[in-house]
C-alpha cells in the first residue's frame, strides 16, 4: 500500500513514512492510493470476529508486509484491545426499533479517541524499536485527544509527547487528565487562543524545514488515527444489523475525522446509507453542506469543546476524494487561509 498527498507535492510514500511524519511535506494530508474492498461474503465472515481480530482484518490492507509483517501487526491489534478497554469494549443502547446510541467511552481515558490512539501508540512503539530511533510527538487538542494521546504513547520509552491545548477552553476533567499525568516524557502546554490556533502551530512545526528532530502527529491529520477509527463502524454495524441492510450514522463532528472514518468504511463496502454531520454553534460544516460555502467565523466556546473548531482538517481528505485534483485542494486551502 502506498500513500499520496492531497496537495500533490510529494511522491508516493510508505505506511511507515505516513506514520512517522503525519503531515505531508507540502502541507497536505496523506491518503491511501487505493482502499481495501469487502464483498458481502467477506462481511459475513467479519461479523463473527472479536474486536481485536476485526481490527486486524479491516486495517491490515493499509499496511504492507515490508512495513509491518502481518503476523506482528496481528499481535499489536490483540495487545491494544485488551484489559485497557474492559470486558465490554463497546456497548450499544437501544432507543427504539431503529435507533441506537453507540457508546465509545470504555477506553482508559473515557474518550472515543482511545480506540485509535491506543493502536497508534502500540504501532509507534513497534516501529521505533525496529528502527532503533526516538520520536517527538506533537499534538493539538480541545480536550480528549490530549489525554488519549498521552495515555496511548507514554508507555514507549522512545517517545516524548508535547500536547498544545487552548487555555481555559477544555473541560476541567480533561485538563487534569493531561496536566497531572506523571511521566517525564510528557509535556502539556496551554496556548492563549482556541483549538484552531493550536492546530495551526502544530502544522507550522511540521512545515518548518530546518527541524532537527523526528516529529510525528497524533491528531487525526495522521492517517493512522483514521485507520483505527474504521473498526468501530464495522463492529457497531454488525451488532445492530444481521441481514446486511444499510444503516445510517449521526456523528458529532469537529475535525471531521470520525465521520470521515465512516465515509471510508462505506467506500470499503460497509452498507452505510447516510452519514449525518452533527454540530454545535461552531457550525462551519453544517453551513457548508447546507449552502456550499465554507467561511470562517470566530470560534464560540461551548460545553462540547471538542467541536469548537472552524478549520476541520480532515475535510480536505473528503474534497480530494471527490475531486482527485491536488491543484483544486491547494487553491481552496490557500483561499481559506
Regions found by a protein language model. Give the residues of each.
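PLP-dependent amino-acid enzyme catalytic core
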Residues: 1-337
Amino acid at each position: 500500500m502506498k500513500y499520496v498527498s492531497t496537495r500533490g507535492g510529494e511522491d508516493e510514500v510508505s505506511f511507515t513514512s505516513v506514520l512517522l511524519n503525519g503531515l505531508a511535506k507540502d502541507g497536505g494530508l496523506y491518503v491511501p492510493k487505493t482502499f481495501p474492498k469487502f464483498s458481502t461474503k467477506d462481511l459475513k465472515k467479519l461479523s463473527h470476529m472479536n474486536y481485536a481480530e476485526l481490527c486486524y482484518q479491516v486495517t491490515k490492507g493499509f499496511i504492507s508486509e515490508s512495513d509491518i509483517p502481518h503476523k506482528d501487526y496481528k499481535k499489536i491489534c490483540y495487545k491494544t484491545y485488551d484489559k485497557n478497554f474492559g470486558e465490554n469494549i463497546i456497548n450499544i443502547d437501544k432507543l427504539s426499533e431503529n435507533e441506537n446510541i453507540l457508546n465509545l467511552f470504555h477506553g482508559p481515558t473515557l474518550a472515543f479517541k482511545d480506540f485509535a490512539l491506543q493502536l497508534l501508540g502500540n504501532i509507534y512503539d513497534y516501529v521505533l524499536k525496529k528502527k532503533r530511533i526516538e520520536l517527538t510527538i506533537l499534538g493539538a487538542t480541545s480536550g480528549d485527544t490530549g489525554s488519549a494521546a498521552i495515555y496511548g504513547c507514554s508507555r514507549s520509552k522512545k517517545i516524548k509527547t508535547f500536547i498544545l491545548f487552548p487555555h481555559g477552553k477544555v473541560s476541567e476533567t480533561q485538563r487534569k487528565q493531561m496536566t497531572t499525568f506523571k511521566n517525564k516524557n510528557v509535556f502539556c502546554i496551554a496556548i492563549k487562543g482556541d483549538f484552531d490556533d493550536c492546530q495551526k502551530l502544530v502544522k507550522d512545526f511540521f512545515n518548518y524545514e530546518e527541524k532537527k528532530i523526528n516529529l510525528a502527529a497524533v491528531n487525526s491529520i495522521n492517517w493512522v488515527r483514521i485507520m483505527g477509527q474504521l473498526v468501530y463502524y464495522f463492529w457497531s454495524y454488525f451488532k445492530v444489523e444481521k441481514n446486511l441492510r444499510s444503516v445510517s450514522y449521526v456523528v458529532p463532528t469537529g475535525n471531521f475525522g470520525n465521520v470521515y472514518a465512516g465515509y471510508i468504511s462505506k467506500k470499503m463496502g460497509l452498507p452505510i446509507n447516510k452519514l449525518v454531520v452533527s454540530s454545535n454553534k461552531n457550525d462551519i460544516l453544517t453551513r457548508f453542506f447546507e449552502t456550499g460555502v465554507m467561511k470562517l467565523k470566530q470560534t464560540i466556546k461551548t460545553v462540547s469543546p471538542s467541536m469548537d473548531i472552524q478549520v476541520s482538517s480532515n475535510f480536505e481528505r473528503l474534497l480530494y476524494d471527490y475531486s482527485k485534483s491536488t491543484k483544486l485542494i491547494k487553491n481552496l486551502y490557500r483561499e481559506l487561509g
